[in-house]
């Protein structure tokens, strides 16, 4: 027989707050959840994401050790 009273209390209508305003309700073991980011204000989901043109770590490594194919072609010429 399962043990009694070992499961946390379930709140099927837990309120989720972002910046002091209620944004949605979900099921949770906490009655209220406070979040910094949610799908309504995240840049990826709102379409305001900015593409930052930065060099990746792999490209930086390859350039540092001269392993990029484009760099080898320039150095051989």
UniProtKB/Swiss-Prot annotation:
Q: Which SUPFAM superfamilies match?
A: L28p-like (SSF143800)
Species whose genome carries this gene: Synechococcus elongatus (strain ATCC 33912 / PCC 7942 / FACHB-805) (Anacystis nidulans R2)
Could you name the domain of life of the organism this protein comes from?
A: Bacteria
Q: Which GO terms describe its cellular component?
A: ribonucleoprotein complex; ribosome
Which Pfam family is one of this chain's hits?
A: Ribosomal_L31
Official protein name in the record: Large ribosomal subunit protein bL31
One GO biological process this protein is involved in is: translation
One MF term from GO for this chain? Answer: rRNA binding
Protein role: Binds the 23S rRNA.
Q: Which UniProt keywords apply?
A: Ribonucleoprotein, Ribosomal protein, RNA-binding, rRNA-binding
Q: Name the InterPro entries for this protein.
A: Ribosomal_bL28/bL31-like_sf (IPR034704), Ribosomal_bL31 (IPR002150), Ribosomal_bL31_A (IPR027491), Ribosomal_bL31_sf (IPR042105)
Assembly and interaction partners: Part of the 50S ribosomal subunit.
The encoding gene is rpmE
Q: Identify its protein family.
A: Belongs to the bacterial ribosomal protein bL31 family. Type A subfamily.
Q: Which NCBIfam families match?
A: L31, PRK00019.1, PRK00528.1
The record ties this protein, via Gene3D superfamilies, to: Ribosomal protein L31
């Amino acid at each position: 027989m399962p043990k009694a009273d070992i499961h946390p209390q379930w709140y099927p209508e837990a309120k989720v707050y972002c910046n002091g305003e209620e944004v949605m309700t979900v099921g949770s073991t906490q009655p209220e959840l406070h979040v910094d980011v949610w799908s309504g204000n995240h840049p990826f989901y709102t379409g305001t994401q900015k593409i930052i043109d930065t060099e990746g770590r792999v490209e930086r490594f390859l350039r540092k050790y001269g392993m990029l194919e484009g760099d080898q072609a320039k150095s051989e010429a």
